[in-house]
């Protein structure tokens, strides 16, 4: 069975 993987959390860009 194909398991749906939730999208990764948004990455915050630190400058």
UniProtKB/Swiss-Prot annotation:
Modification sites for 4-hydroxyproline: 6-10
Primary subcellular site in the record, as a coarse category: secreted
Entry keyword annotation includes Ligase: no
Alphabetical keyword list: Cell wall, Hydroxylation, Secreted
This protein's GO CC annotations: extracellular region
Location(s), subcellular: Secreted, Cell wall
Name by which UniProt lists this protein: 200 kDa cell wall protein
Record organism: Nicotiana tabacum (Common tobacco)
């Amino acid at each position: 069975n194909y398991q749906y993987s939730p999208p990764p959390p948004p990455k915050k860009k630190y400058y």
